[in-house]
């Protein structure tokens, strides 16, 4: 959502947020749509939409990990790849990996590794591919939610179901599920 400079300045002068720009309460989330099985040829897949953000995740595996020197004899390996499609934002982004997408891949891998139990799959790999075709705000959150659903859809054992939400701060007030205008105006998620 585009927010003119005048509106941003007005929000700052008035101490911001007696209510949020889109009318939500501070702790209210945007409408969400979650679906599994969106890619029939995948071992597991899901899509997650909130506000103007959509993420899709595909799971492949468990399958034998090659090269063999990367295998773990005690448990399987989880690999996560996160990417934003070039047309996902107003300012077209360069296709392919970026430092930001590699960092988010590692954060998602770390978060998902804490709940996934691959002890029953030694010497294997489970690959999770997250793509964001439409970005408003909270892309890593949408990606994590889609990935967790795709892992469950693939039947990968998990200790618990992972969920994520973006929280921002405005004038000492916490805002749950920040939108693009809030994210740009403050130090929000990303």
Residue ranges and their predicted role:
Residues 1-190:
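Polyanion-binding surfaces on beta-sheet-dominated domains and ring/shell assemblies
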